[in-house]
Amino acid sequence: MNAEFPMLNTTLCYLEQGGKWLMLHRVTKKNDMNHDKWIGVGGKFEPFESPEDCLLREVREETGLTLTNYRLRGIVTFLLGSLTEYMFLHTADGWTGELVKDAARNEGVLEWVPKSEVEALPVWEGDKIFFRLLKEDRPFFSLKLKYEGDDLTEAVLDLSLIHI
């Protein structure tokens, strides 16, 4: 790995139930790039994990649920200064166990949010693009999002530039 240009691998999952997504309101950590944003559940890969291993572990840690039906929807590449993050984006509609609402207390607060209301919440501009793709049930996609600070400056979907 090039220390000058680090890479990060993460997973993110939106659990779906009754027209709602389970979302995490990131309000706990003060020095958090996602502070006060609403995102799905997920996190960073640990050594030797596959995307699926990371997905299952992160969802279990942050919700108390064990996924039984999930789908890889796309890969989102974030360009954040010199950092490149590859995020494996999933949705899930099957699980076992009971939701532990305070399982993610170190990260924030879990809430079921109607899909129609998500874009009105404090979310990253690029997330609005993949929310639309998820709602349209778009087949597997590759989305590249370039940020300068908090500002989305470029979005490329399946190698086509999107006007933002």
Predicted features along the sequence, with ranges:
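Conserved N-terminal beta-strand and adjoining loop/helix that marks the start
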Residues: 1-23, 44
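Short, charged/polar surface micro-motifs in flexible loops or helix N-caps
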Residues: 16-20, 29-30, 46, 92-98, ...
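A conserved beta-turn-beta hairpin within the catalytic core of GNAT-like acetyltransferases
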Residues: 31-36
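Unchanged
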Residues: 45-68, 78-133, 153-160
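Low-complexity, intrinsically disordered Gly/Pro/Thr-rich segments
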Residues: 139-148
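Conserved small/polar residues in nucleotide/adenosyl-binding loops
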Residues: 162-164
